[in-house]
A protein has these predicted regions:
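Short helix-coil junctions and helix-kink-helix linkers
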Residues: 165-190
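Membrane-inserting effector segments that mediate pore formation, membrane fusion
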Residues: 1-49
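Long, low-complexity, charged/polar intrinsically disordered regions in eukaryotic proteins
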Residues: 81-144
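Eukaryote-specific, cytoplasm-facing alpha-helical/coiled-coil scaffolding segments in long proteins
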Residues: 136-139, 170-179, 221-231
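Non-catalytic interaction/regulatory modules that flank or connect domains
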Residues: 132-138, 143-148, 152-169
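Amphipathic, membrane-inserting segments
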Residues: 43-90
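Short amphipathic alpha-helical interaction segments
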Residues: 182-244
């Protein structure tokens, strides 16, 4: 894959990021894989370029959907002068080079994009390094399991309309959970006890987080009283979520 063609196709600012990152990344990959076979080295470069392309696409989406211009050439140039950003980017490129997984590439790309926009000492910056390292120790299904856990435990709609009838509230809550569960729940169907133990072992989750928790009460949070028991017993996504939490 030609880096020049890739960066040109993506656009000016995002493309510049790819060029600058690849100028460094190719050297990092060459050094890391110097004692490996030629085919492994070439595949590593292909994987890393796929990841960088996803970073650029992520940057472009932010540019296109924001009235301001959050990612400028100045922001990019400043980031590459930051030792912490450079170290996080290096680790992300090496991790991406070791796998063809698009799921991992997308998540790494999101992390690097968020880090690109963050101040050097805020929580996003501090968490980025930890998150990148965690990805290196996880399979894609583990990442989906973590995403599902965060969704169920922490994420709720910013607001629920006032004055809904019980029927309307039941429908609103059901629709919200279906929309947000659907991309994740089918990705963790084959998650085993060994997978859960692995997540505990790499300090991504704690068993105590789930002990004694009533799933129905968790799903009511943010909505109030709605037909959650019916959702968990009759709707496919609800039944799968219940099975997942009972593992």
């Amino acid at each position: 894959v030609s880096i020049a063609v890739t960066s040109a196709a993506i656009g000016s600012v995002a493309g510049k990021f790819v060029e600058k990152a690849w100028n460094l990344g190719e050297k990092w990959i060459t050094e890391y894989f110097k004692n490996h076979g030629k085919e492994a080295q070439e595949k590593a470069k292909e994987n890393a370029l796929s990841f960088l392309t996803k970073v650029a696409e992520s940057v472009k989406v932010i540019q296109d959907n924001t009235k301001t211009d959050p990612v400028t050439l100045e922001v990019i140039n400043t980031s590459f002068k930051d030792p912490d950003f450079s170290a996080v980017l290096q680790r992300a490129i090496i991790i991406s080079a070791r796998t063809p997984s698009e799921d991992k590439h997308k998540i790494l790309a999101r992390l690097i994009t968020e880090r690109l926009l963050a101040n050097s000492e805020d929580m996003i910056s501090l968490a980025s390094s930890v998150a990148v390292e965690a990805i290196s120790a996880l399979k894609a299904k583990h990442l989906y399991a973590l995403g599902l856990s965060v969704l169920v435990e922490d994420i709720r709609p910013t607001s629920v309309p006032k004055g809904l009838t019980q029927k309307q509230l039941n429908q609103a809550a059901r629709d919200w959970w279906l929309k947000n569960l659907s991309p994740l729940i089918h990705k963790v169907e084959d998650l085993s006890d060994i997978d859960i133990r692995h997540l505990v072992g790499v300090n991504c989750i704690e068993y105590e987080l789930f002990i004694g928790r009533d799933l129905a009460q968790i799903l009511k949070s943010g909505f109030g009283e709605w037909e959650v028991d019916k959702f968990l017993s009759e709707i496919e996504e609800g039944k799968k979520l219940k099975e997942y939490y009972e593992k």
